[in-house]
Amino acid sequence: MALNAGCASQGDVKGRDFEMSSVMKNDIDLVAETHQRVVFNALRQLAIKLYKRNPQEWKKAGQPSLEMAVKTITANPLPLIANISNIEQIRLAFDERYQGDRVKAYIVGLEAMVLASYDNHRSFYIHHMLEAQKLYDSARNIELASWLIRKKYKSNGKLFLLSSVGTPEINLSFERLFGKMINAQDMMAQIIADRSHRQ
């Protein structure tokens, strides 16, 4: 009895409601959707944290509130900046010449990069074939993006975006989000690689 009490759940894990479209999915499709959802949820949490520490950014875009700014940059389809790649959009957040919302550039660039690793699909069916290398590369890009936000400074010596500087608790919360995204992409890359080797 004591063991059960010690392992008591602190919350519920809820899956998605059944949809008829799920009949056309195999296990890998469902796993891919789950991993992608984990990453996008983490990016949304990251956007909230960054806007809280950098409120001047959502105000640049004329948003009425932090909540509306987050809703805008996590919309589907993504509010991409025209004619630049997702990687270039991430880098735009660290360009001193850029006068726009740096959090938006950073988060939307990451969202677009992750989505590209899933061949720009949000739902997967039996005929979809993901590439392990794209997923693996995206995990490495997330690592680089994490480094940029912590280490990239303006010419005046200030960080472009305040993130994990401050208390150890704040540092840990940011690191957990990046770690969650990297782990999800690496895990999905390994699953796809293992499946490809079995075929």
Language-model-derived ranges and their functions:
Residues 3-6:
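C-terminal motif of bacterial Sec signal peptides marking the signal peptidase cleavage site
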Residues 8-103:
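N-terminal Sec/ER secretory leader and immediately downstream segment
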Residues 9-15, 22-30, 51-54, 168-199:
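Short, cationic, amphipathic peptide segments
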Residues 59-196:
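Mature extracellular/secreted ectodomains of secretory-pathway proteins
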